[in-house]
Swiss-Prot record:
Keyword Nuclease: no
PANTHER family assigned: ISOCITRATE DEHYDROGENASE KINASE_PHOSPHATASE (PTHR39559:SF1), PTHR39559
Record's keyword terms, sorted: ATP-binding, Cytoplasm, Glyoxylate bypass, Hydrolase, Kinase, Nucleotide-binding, Protein phosphatase, Serine/threonine-protein kinase, Transferase, Tricarboxylic acid cycle
Places the protein is found: Cytoplasm
Protein name: Isocitrate dehydrogenase kinase/phosphatase
Primary site of residence: cytoplasm
Annotated family: Belongs to the AceK family.
Single GO BP term: glyoxylate cycle
Organism of derivation: Escherichia coli (strain SMS-3-5 / SECEC)
Domain of life: Bacteria
Lineage of the organism: Bacteria, Pseudomonadati, Pseudomonadota, Gammaproteobacteria, Enterobacterales
Active-site residues (renumbered): 371
Record gene name: aceK
Any one Gene Ontology cellular component term annotated for this protein: cytoplasm
């Protein structure tokens, strides 16, 4: 291989990343126009397009490199020199951290995810940690309450770039001040001020103003979701000022925000203060840098593994028919491997399961479907695997495992946030907690359905409970679009004997679903049945589901709120 080619390859990879992130920012910058035009289908399509950009540009760079090298193989020394040249390009580069992830992706594509060593890849960053604590251009603007909070908020709202009319700006400001007064008290509020991000955060049908409420006793989140009326007028739906509320808004079960971030590391650093419970990976995920979030997630895993004395075990809960799930007892993620063979009732292929997980990645998750990171050739030290889990892996997924002596390589797996399985949660709670869980479960089903997602298998074991008490779906092998399902009423029996027969007295075709049957497995527990009938009886009616299908086919996009209905100003103050 000619000398000097290493620098050309390094420059080609970085230029490829520049092109990718330029397109990323271009798609993101259209969020305001899509919001103002209320083009919600374009919002959904832009989200999918932006997700695809990364892999598309990795592919373009790989083809360029194959042309540059004429398809010749490269030795280890050559690859190390390429990485050295690439590292030298990064100290003054504004998006160095994602550029490192892009380099990793190109390498993995070229070498089929093999020989993934710290010498060849940026397993950990080459740059100083949190390099962007100081940046040339401020990310946010400060607003002080010298003339009262009504005046402050009027300036904040007047500063927004949105070009639509407001329905009633004074009313919304009054509601915000009322909320802040109730939260902080008059004296504390008078001594507080705001710091507001320069860019709005767009997602679904809302534009979010994100800020920091700086009080004498500390800094709080300040989040305002801006929506449109049917007449295209703007209004503020609520004001959120707790870290728990902010954590849910930026949660792992929600779609990525569209926020213009030429310096993503700086934005992540700015967000940390109001999202103290979020990891670096989760913050990058929230702003749409999902591939770099995968890098950070892997780094978090490695750091945890180095500092613990735990072994991987099978995850708690009912064993799945399609996925083998394992975890580290103290780590907040689970690792999911597709089994070699499925239970007989699961008539699907591994490719179908992968397609379902990709569908979830690209779809609006409405706060009810956990995001995942997909890995190939994932290496585990045998000493970190419990004997029982090793036996289970070899029994259920041997075709996906390569034995390297002291290590195993799992050809393909997903990493996902760990939650308490809903069936276990329901066994452990009583009273209001039980009621809240059943309400959350039904709301999760409704919101998924409104977003054109039918879970398929609605058993409690396929849902989890987050640390904030939200119910989230995480078993995707039977997922499909609502519009693909035929919701039917069970025909009346022809004879009394029909109801006692082992086989149904009516024909059942692929895609047929009978909501009346949900009652049999969702209401069997006498503690749960009455609550379900009280709050969610309409889920057992086929006409409820058909009405939702009609709205979807008519092009209606439902509103999705990242907070409780009772927190909306229209409910709370009217």
């Amino acid at each position: 291989m000619p000398r000097g080619l290493e620098l050309l390859i390094a420059q080609t990879i970085l230029q490829g990343f520049d092109a990718q992130y330029g397109r990323f920012l271009e798609v993101t910058s259209g969020a305001q126009q899509r919001f103002e035009q209320a083009d919600w289908h374009a919002v959904q399509q832009a989200m999918k397009n932006r997700i695809h950009l990364y892999d598309h540009h990795v592919g373009l760079v790989v083809e360029q490199l194959r042309c540059i090298t004429n398809g010749q193989s490269t030795d280890a020394a050559f690859l190390l020199r390429v990485k050295e040249h690439y590292t030298r390009l990064l100290p003054d580069y504004p998006r160095f951290e994602i550029a490192e992830s892009f380099f990793n992706s190109v390498y993995c594509r070229l070498f089929d995810h093999r020989s993934l060593t710290p010498e060849r890849l940026f397993i950990f960053s080459s740059q100083p940690e949190r390099r962007f604590r100081t940046i040339p251009r401020p990310l946010a603007k400060d607003f002080h309450s010298d003339h009262g909070w009504e005046s402050l908020l009027m300036r904040v709202i007047s500063d927004l770039p949105l070009r639509l009319r407001w329905q009633n700006k004074s009313r919304d400001i009054h509601y915000i001040v009322r909320h802040l007064t109730e939260t902080l008290g008059t004296d504390n509020l008078a001594e507080s001020h705001l710091q507001v991000a320069n860019e709005l955060f767009y997602r679904n049908k809302a534009a979010w103003l994100v800020g920091k409420l700086i009080t004498p006793s500390g800094t709080l989140p300040f989040l305002l979701p801006i929506h449109q009326t049917d007449d295209g007028e703007l209004f503020i739906d609520t004001c959120l000022t707790t870290t728990a509320e902010a954590s849910i808004v930026f949660g792992f079960a929600r779609s990525y925000f569209m926020v213009y971030a030429p310096l993503p590391a700086a934005l992540v650093e700015w967000l940390r203060e109001i999202l103290p419970g979020k990891t670096t990976a989760e913050l990058y995920m929230a702003i749409g840098c999902q591939k770099h979030a995968k890098t950070e997630s892997y780094r978090e895993y490695l750091v945890y593994l180095q500092g613990c004395n735990e072994q991987f075990i099978e995850a708690p809960g009912i064993r799945g028919m399609v996925m083998l799930v394992f975890t580290l007892p103290g780590f907040d993620r689970v690792f999911k491997v597709i089994k070699d063979r499925f239970a007989p009732q699961k008539e699907m292929s591994a490719a179908h399961v992968c397609a379902c997980y990709q569908l979830v990645k690209e779809h609006d998750r409405v706060g009810r479907m956990a995001d995942t990171q997909e890995f190939e050739n994932f290496v585990l030290e045998k000493r970190h695997i419990s004997p029982a889990l090793m036996e289970l892996l070899l029994q259920e997924a041997a075709e996906k495992i390569t034995d390297l002596g002291e290590q195993i390589v799992i050809r393909h797996l997903y990493i996902e946030r760990r939650m308490v399985p809903l069936n276990i949660w329901l066994e452990q709670v009583e009273g209001q907690q039980l009621r809240d869980a059943i309400e959350e479960y039904g709301n999760a089903i409704r919101q998924l359905a409104a977003a054109n997602i039918f879970p398929g298998d609605m058993l409690f074991k396929n849902f989890g409970v987050t640390r904030h008490g939200r119910v989230v779906f995480y078993d995707y092998d039977e997922i499909c679009y609502m519009t693909e399902v035929n919701f039917r009423d069970i025909p009346p029996p022809r004879y009394p004997e029909d109801e006692l027969a082992s086989e149904p007295w009516y024909s059942v075709s692929p895609g047929d679903v009978f909501p009346e049957e949900f009652r049999h497995w969702l209401c069997a527990d006498p503690r749960i049945g009455p609550l379900f009938e009280e709050m969610h009886a309409d889920l057992f009616r086929a006409d409820y589901w058909r009405a939702l299908q009609n709205r979807i086919r008519e092009g209606h996009v439902e509103d999705v709120y990242a907070y409780r209905r009772r927190q909306r100003f229209s409910v709370r103050f009217v």
